[in-house]
């Protein structure tokens, strides 16, 4: 590193993947987090600090914060899923859980887990990102509210970033607005007043700055390498600015805070930068008779691993199918795509599907979180670490997941069904993302929102309505069947249906129809099949598989 200017920014992933899209529990307020921060430091032997064990967090969350055990585990496991672990480590954990024969055995294994205490406190604090502010609600909109007006379709407009989890302006504003609180949360108790505030002489430990690297990273202007915050803060030429003392191995609270505020800038790998200066991808074609043009942008040509991003909007009335290096390990946002069939058959880091209608999404394994918001009549087929849904209507989820699907607020007529497809590289992609076939909690969703805890918000697909899904593309690879197979009830339904078809074929064969009768029968069957294609929407899917005219073909990734 030379003496050039330091640039810092707020990392996107903790917010995209780590901030649950609901208002946090009231006990996650700063007041309680400060109390937890002090409490855990008195429990070093019991697993409170510097690593927080699941058993200690369960005691705090359930005993002191009055959270349900399932909710306490949800936040603990969400944070743990952000940790840098190899796919092999994740697969090993799945194997351990799949061998457990009871809830007590599962709990015994969970008790072996621990997370970084200070980073976990920061993680709990950023849940405030989606806190509903009455004041903001009152002053933030015109009255009457112009909700009936169509939103701007332009991807580059801020209107496309209503989801705070994907809005890097919101990430930066949150950290800047709460920077003092974040630093105070990391202070040793003796550095705080009785009211849990810093003083002019408060000192910040190196461990605290290492923890803050969970949210902030940076570089030196003119360099390509990205450094965690603590490496830059400890860089010798910056000691005067950051307030680091070699003698005490601590930072001056106020000098460090001032330096952070001076250096914080926009995320060069965030959504805004991707939309403004990212590479435009010609993956979709213009549909005749439509005015909206599909927009797909990525930053994978400049972004390091873990910072890759693909944003796709306004894909309309077509089939889009990709297996591309551009998608591998990327955070993907799919926005306002309607009446389409979208196949993204690569290992993905996270996926957010927002404001889409009447579409089918077939995804490669999603290593962290798959989230749907404000979607209508959408079918999603995926292997994912976690699924969460909010404000959806009439959506079907064919999933394989090692965690309970999260039903957040505003959902209606949700259907869960077993994962029912495969493509040749699927098992290889699952291994690369650390996702196994067991345990699989597709049929055990968790209703997280308070507004509607009724189980009637969702149903499990009846076996009589179940069909397998065929991916109509040729690829290289070894997977030839659905990973993990199908639940017995669904396999039985398929077998019974197959038997009925065989009986019907035998009946037709033995009917000894004349040549004219066979022709009439063939026409009748074809007409009925054509009606079925139209009524089920499969006709549109077949039509969209026909390659577009030359000049508007999908480009390679």
Curated annotation (Swiss-Prot):
One of its GO terms (biological process) is regulation of cell shape. One of its GO terms (cellular component) is cytoplasm. InterPro entries: C-CAP_CF_C-like, CAP/MinC_C, CAP_C_sf, CARP_motif, TBCC1, Tubulin-bd_cofactor_C_dom. Residues 290-435 form the C-CAP/cofactor C-like domain. Pfam families: TBCC. SUPFAM superfamilies: C-terminal domain of adenylylcyclase associated protein (SSF69340). It is found in: Cytoplasm, Cytoskeleton, Microtubule organizing center, Centrosome; Cytoplasm, Cytoskeleton, Spindle pole. Keywords: Cytoplasm, Cytoskeleton. Coiled coil: none annotated. Belongs to the TBCC family. Plays a role in the regulation of centrosome and Golgi apparatus positioning, with consequences on cell shape and cell migration. This is TBCC domain-containing protein 1. It comes from Bos taurus. The lineage of its organism: Eukaryota, Metazoa, Chordata, Craniata, Vertebrata. The gene is TBCCD1.
């Amino acid at each position: 590193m030379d003496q050039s200017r330091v640039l810092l920014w707020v990392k996107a992933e903790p917010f995209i993947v780590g901030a649950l899209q609901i208002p946090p529990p009231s006990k996650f307020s700063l007041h309680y987090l400060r109390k937890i921060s002090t409490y855990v430091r008195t429990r070093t032997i019991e697993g409170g600090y510097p690593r927080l064990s699941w058993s200690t967090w369960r005691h705090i969350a359930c005993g002191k914060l009055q959270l349900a055990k399932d909710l306490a585990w949800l936040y603990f496991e969400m944070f743990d899923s952000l940790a840098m672990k190899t796919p092999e480590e994740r697969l090993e954990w799945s194997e351990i859980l799949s061998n457990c024969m009871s809830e007590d055995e599962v709990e015994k294994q969970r008790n072996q887990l621990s997370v970084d205490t200070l980073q976990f406190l920061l993680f709990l604090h950023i849940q405030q990102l989606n806190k509903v502010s009455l004041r903001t609600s009152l002053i933030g909109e015109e009255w009457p509210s112009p909700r009936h007006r169509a939103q701007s379709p332009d991807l580059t407009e801020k209107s496309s970033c209503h989801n705070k989890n994907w809005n890097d302006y919101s990430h930066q504003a949150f950290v800047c607005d709460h920077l003092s609180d974040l630093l105070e949360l990391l202070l040793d108790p003796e550095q705080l007043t009785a009211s849990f505030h810093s003083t002019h002489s408060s000192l910040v430990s190196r461990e605290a700055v290492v923890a803050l690297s969970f949210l902030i990273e940076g570089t030196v202007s003119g360099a390509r390498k990205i450094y965690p915050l603590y490496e830059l803060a400890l860089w010798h030429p910056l000691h005067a600015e950051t307030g680091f003392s070699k003698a005490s191995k601590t930072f001056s609270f106020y000098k460090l805070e001032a330096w952070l505020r001076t250096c914080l800038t926009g995320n060069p790998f965030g959504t805004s930068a991707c939309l403004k200066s990212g590479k435009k991808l010609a993956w979709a074609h213009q549909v005749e008779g439509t005015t909206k043009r599909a927009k797909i942008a990525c930053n994978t040509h400049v972004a390091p691993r873990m910072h890759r991003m693909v944003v796709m909007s306004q894909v309309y009335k077509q089939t889009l199918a990709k297996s591309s290096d551009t998608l591998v390990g990327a955070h993907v946002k799919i926005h306002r795509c309607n009446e389409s069939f979208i196949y993204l058959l690569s290992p993905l880091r996270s996926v957010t599907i927002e404001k889409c209608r009447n579409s089918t999404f077939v995804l490669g394994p999603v290593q962290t979180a798959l989230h749907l918001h404000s979607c209508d009549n959408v079918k999603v087929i995926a292997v994912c670490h976690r699924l969460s849904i909010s404000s959806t209507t009439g959506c079907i989820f064919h999933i394989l997941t090692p965690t309970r699907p999260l039903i957040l607020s505003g959902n209606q007529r949700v259907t869960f069904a077993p994962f029912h497809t495969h493509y040749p590289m699927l098992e290889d992609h699952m291994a690369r993302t650390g996702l196994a076939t067991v345990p699989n909690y597709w049929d055990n969703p968790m209703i997280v929102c308070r507004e509607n805890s009724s189980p009637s918000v969702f149903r499990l697909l009846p076996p009589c309505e179940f069909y397998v899904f065929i991916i109509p593309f040729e690829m290289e690879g070894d997977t030839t069947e659905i990973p993990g197979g199908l639940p017995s009830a669904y396999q039985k339904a398929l077998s019974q249906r197959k038997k009925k078809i065989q009986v019907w074929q035998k009946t037709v064969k033995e009917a000894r129809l004349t040549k004219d009768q066979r022709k009439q029968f063939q026409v009748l069957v074809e007409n009925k099949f054509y009606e079925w294609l139209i009524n089920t929407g499969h006709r549109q899917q077949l039509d969209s598989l026909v390659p577009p005219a030359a000049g508007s073909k999908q480009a390679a990734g």
